[in-house]
Amino acid sequence: MSVIFAPDWLRGKAKVNQETIQRLLEENDQLIRCIVEYQNKGRANECVQYQHVLHRNLIYLATIADANTSSLTKAVE
């Protein structure tokens, strides 16, 4: 299960730290390897679930990056 899955009542309250981001990056690496392996074996249908988790992780990381960029811009102003 992805490290970003959390119940609705916890969303927005979880602390994002370097360890969490690193775990997501490592998970994404493993997901990409699984996706490539399934595709090489001609089993593209099986890799769809991994693609969904990878997509969710990437959106989450992009959201964190955008939030950090916004807060840095406001701090400079």
Swiss-Prot record:
Entry-linked Pfam families: SSXT
Short motif SH2-binding, span: 50-53
Domain of life per record: Eukaryota
Entries under InterPro entries matching the protein: SS18_N
Assigned protein family: Belongs to the SS18 family.
Name under which the protein is recorded: SS18-like protein 2
Species this chain originates from: Mus musculus (Mouse)
Upper taxonomic lineage: Eukaryota, Metazoa, Chordata, Craniata, Vertebrata
